[in-house]
């Protein structure tokens, strides 16, 4: 049995445990500070350094330099709380922390994350709390507090600092700077604001009286220790959630009298008989999160004002107490409008830095949310057909965008431009202009939670039959609108249903294209067609004739063949000469380098060849016969080849590939094949 325990115990990092439980004298702590002044950082400095410890990545988007902070990818938890597609709001948030870290004024403000429901506000707050907790365990994030020990007049052997105060607060403010300089500590780097909390101040005064003012003897009763922040242990990380007015009072934030200890100390004004366990005190040295902050009773807001502006709180029956913590809250639009319209809350508005956290407006980033939640490792025994999550994400993003004012631009095209796709007639400047004219995009629309709920419904539905596809999910999304509590207006429901129709049309175009490519994915046939085209283009540009391989006769270049290919990618008659010369110049440049031309390296030509081959082969495959009950053996074999290509090249399974082929076949049967 002992060997099994030893095996289990071997996973415990004893060295790390000892580092986290380090304790020493006040003199040893001064030496720690002298060597590493960063241990005395305030909460905002530590928060900023924590985020920056994960690095920063610059990139250009629509001619604008943006910064991505990998911290918000949640690398420590393998992306469990990763925030996608919100680099601009997160840049603003980090800039607030940076400004506060440098003491430029934002450290005296409440940070308010504002946005629609399900836009990652609470996730961001949770990440910051988790990040601080993890950072405090690392050598570079170390911070310290202290206990009183061996007190000559106390009932307890050890009395911790009730709010985990900074040990340098023990040096009186009046001569702290001179004392630190005398100890060889750089006071330009170590700037400790604030004084002792009421409990420690009381003990300090009693000891000073006891030792006749000899500070050196008083400080012998101090044991400095490493401080590890922990939300679960309520150390340096606090969370406050509003309740109904009858069941909450300000003591939840600022602490309350411990009536049991009054019997020990004889007075309720003795700070040792006070529980410094309000959320503000718990969060000292770290962060406090206010969930749905603007639902707080007005009485609580006065505590919030002092805590943010002065970094002080007022416990019942005691003097103001210094605190050092990041104050962050979050709220939705409805509650924020109450703040804006309430003249009694002007003081809070004035002390608030609002950061809008919108929904994602980039399709690829929205898709990542659902790909993470419904990955193959999580979803067992049910196949999610290709484009299912993409179409759900497309609908969600489209509901958040403003309709384009330009007549020739559709909502789906606008969505594609935002996603980085290039469209004829639109440049990066066009995208910049679109965004400028739609500044409120992302502040309304469908929440990712609604999409996730409906995907979950589909996965457990009897209709799934081992596979869910875009139509099944889009129909589920449509049906859910009738009872969606956040979509109350019929106008919005009608608009969202119209967008579902647009997304279905987009999906139809995608699968038609995939089936076309699967049919024309015969490498040998494509290579032959390409060689034939190049021979004719070469003869045309060099004003030569082409030798017919079968008759041996020299003939004029096959203009009909060349135009049938070029027409597939909208090369106008007036531009055909330029296009053909470009192709030949490219082939010539490759030849100089000793390389041969591969049509797959030219995306436009590759697409044109595939479409031409599809046009030539679709009648021989007779895909439209799929919707009939009788399919001859030869046709079935060809269809099976196409199906296997769909499975191999696009990620379908047997069921979803058959469904897509049936769907596209029904379109061809209607004579609606994409040209």
What are these model-predicted stretches?
Residues 1-54:
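N-terminal accessory segments that target, anchor, or regulate ATP-driven/P-loop NTPase machines
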Residues 37-675:
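Conserved ASCE/P-loop NTPase catalytic core
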């Amino acid at each position: 049995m002992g060997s099994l325990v030893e095996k289990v115990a071997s996973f415990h990092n004893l060295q790390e445990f000892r580092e986290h439980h380090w304790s020493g004298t006040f003199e040893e702590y001064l030496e720690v500070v002298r060597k590493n002044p960063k241990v005395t950082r305030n909460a905002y400095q530590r928060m900023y350094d924590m985020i920056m410890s994960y690095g920063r990545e610059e990139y250009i988007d629509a001619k604008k330099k943006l910064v991505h902070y990998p911290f918000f990818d949640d690398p420590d938890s393998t992306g469990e709380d990763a925030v996608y597609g919100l680099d601009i709001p997160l840049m603003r948030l980090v800039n607030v922390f940076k400004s506060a870290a440098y003491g430029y004024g934002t450290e005296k403000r409440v940070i308010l994350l504002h946005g629609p429901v399900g836009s990652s506000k609470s996730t961001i707050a949770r990440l910051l709390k988790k990040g601080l907790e993890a950072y405090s365990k690392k050598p570079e994030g170390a911070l310290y507090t202290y206990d009183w020990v061996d007190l000559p007049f106390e009932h307890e052997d050890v009395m911790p600092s009730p709010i985990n105060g900074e040990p340098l607060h023990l040096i009186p403010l009046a001569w702290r700077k001179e004392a630190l300089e005398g100890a060889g500590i750089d006071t330009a780097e170590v700037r400790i604001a604030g004084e002792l909390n009421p409990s420690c101040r009381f003990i300090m005064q009693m000891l000073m009286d006891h030792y006749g003012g000899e500070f050196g003897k008083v400080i012998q009763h101090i044991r400095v220790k490493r401080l590890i922040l922990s939300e679960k242990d309520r150390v340096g990380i606090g969370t406050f959630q509003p309740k109904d007015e009858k069941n909450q009072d300000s003591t939840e934030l600022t602490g309350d009298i411990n009536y049991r200890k009054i019997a020990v100390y004889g007075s309720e004004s003795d700070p040792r008989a006070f529980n410094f366990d309000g959320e503000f005190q718990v969060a000292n040295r770290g962060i406090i999160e206010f969930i749905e902050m603007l639902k707080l009773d007005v009485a609580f807001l006065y505590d919030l004002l002092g805590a943010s502006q002065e970094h002080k709180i007022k416990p019942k029956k005691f003097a103001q107490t210094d605190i050092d913590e990041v104050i962050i809250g979050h709220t939705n639009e409805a509650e924020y409008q109450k703040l804006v319209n309430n003249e009694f809350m002007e003081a809070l508005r004035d002390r608030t830095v609002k950061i809008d956290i919108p929904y994602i407006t980039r399709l690829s980033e929205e898709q990542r949310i659902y790909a993470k939640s419904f990955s193959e490792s999580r979803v067992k025994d049910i196949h999610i057909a290709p484009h299912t999550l993409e179409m759900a994400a497309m609908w969600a993003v489209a509901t958040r965008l403003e309709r384009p004012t330009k007549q020739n631009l559709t909502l789906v095209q606008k969505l594609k431009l935002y996603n980085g796709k290039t469209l004829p007639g639109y440049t990066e400047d066009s995208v910049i202009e679109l965004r400028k004219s739609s500044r409120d995009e992302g502040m309304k629309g469908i929440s990712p939670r609604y999409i996730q709920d409906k995907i979950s419904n589909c996965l457990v539905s009897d209709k799934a039959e081992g596979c869910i596809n875009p139509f099944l999910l889009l129909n589920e999304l449509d049906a859910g609108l009738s009872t969606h509590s956040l979509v109350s207006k019929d106008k919005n429901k009608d608009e969202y249903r119209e967008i579902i129709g647009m997304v279905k049309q987009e999906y139809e175009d995608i699968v038609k294209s995939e089936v076309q490519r699967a049919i024309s994915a015969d490498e040998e046939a494509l290579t032959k067609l390409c060689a034939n085209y190049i021979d004719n283009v070469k003869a045309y540009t060099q004003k030569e004739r082409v030798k017919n391989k079968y008759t041996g006769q020299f003939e004029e270049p096959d203009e009909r063949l060349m135009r049938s290919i070029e027409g597939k990618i909208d090369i106008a008659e007036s531009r055909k000469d330029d296009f053909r010369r470009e192709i030949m110049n490219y082939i010539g440049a490759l030849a100089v380098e000793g390389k041969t031309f591969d049509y797959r390296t030219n995306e436009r030509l590759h697409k044109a060849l595939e479409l031409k081959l599809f046009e030539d082969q679709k009648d021989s495959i007779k895909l439209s016969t799929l919707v009939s009950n009788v399919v001859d053996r030869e046709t079935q074999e060809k269809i099976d080849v196409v199906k296997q290509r769909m499975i191999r090249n696009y990620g379908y399974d047997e069921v979803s590939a058959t469904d897509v082929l049936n769907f596209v076949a029904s379109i061809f049967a209607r004579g609606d094949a994409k040209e």
